[in-house]
Amino acid sequence: MIRVMATGVFDILHLGHIHYLKESKKLGDELVVVVARDSTARNNGKIPIFDENSRLALISELKVVDRAILGHEGDMMKTVIEVKPDIITLGYDQKFDEAELQSKINKLGITVKIVRISKYDGQLNSSSSVRKKIMELIGERY
């Protein structure tokens, strides 16, 4: 069985997230989605609207997702060790250096393939584009 691990904040769920998860699932038999902790999101400059447990609950309900978990605070490698993925997928906009990530994982003695998933071409394909649209709509109303 090929286990795929997809990670993200998944705040304001949108079609870009669905694309990322569906494309990730196509690469294996089991999709494990790791939802970033609130503290991790904040440390990366993002302020989630939904708290980590709400985001985990939303992701868990998606039929493409086999299992959803919260990531470890401060150490992604602990999550990699726990999940034992064959493949880790990255979103088009995730700020990971693939070679550096591969090196860190190799040092743990784990063999993992890293795959960057393409951008969803539709409108409102990122949380920031959804937030921008909301601000435009609010500005028009008030």
UniProtKB/Swiss-Prot annotation:
Substrates-to-products reaction catalysed:
FMN + ATP + H(+) = FAD + diphosphate
- Which residues are noted in the entry as ATP-binding? 9-10, 14-17, 93, 120
Q: CDD domains attached here?
A: cytidylyltransferase (cd02170)
Q: Which stretches are transmembrane?
A: none
**Enzyme Commission code:** 2.7.7.2
**Matching Pfam families, A to Z?**
CTP_transf_like (PF01467)
Q: Which GO terms describe its biological process?
A: FAD biosynthetic process; FMN metabolic process
Q: Which cofactor does it need?
A: a divalent metal cation
Question: Which pathway is it part of?
Answer: Cofactor biosynthesis; FAD biosynthesis; FAD from FMN: step 1/1
Alphabetically list the UniProt keywords. ATP-binding, FAD, Flavoprotein, FMN, Nucleotide-binding, Nucleotidyltransferase, Transferase
What the entry lists under SUPFAM superfamilies is as follows: Nucleotidylyl transferase (SSF52374)
GO terms of molecular function: ATP binding; FMN adenylyltransferase activity
The function of this protein is: Catalyzes the transfer of the AMP portion of ATP to flavin mononucleotide (FMN) to produce flavin adenine dinucleotide (FAD) coenzyme.
- Family affiliation: Belongs to the archaeal FAD synthase family.
Q: How does it assemble?
A: Homodimer.
According to UniProt, the name of this protein is: FAD synthase
Organism of origin: Thermoplasma volcanium (strain ATCC 51530 / DSM 4299 / JCM 9571 / NBRC 15438 / GSS1)
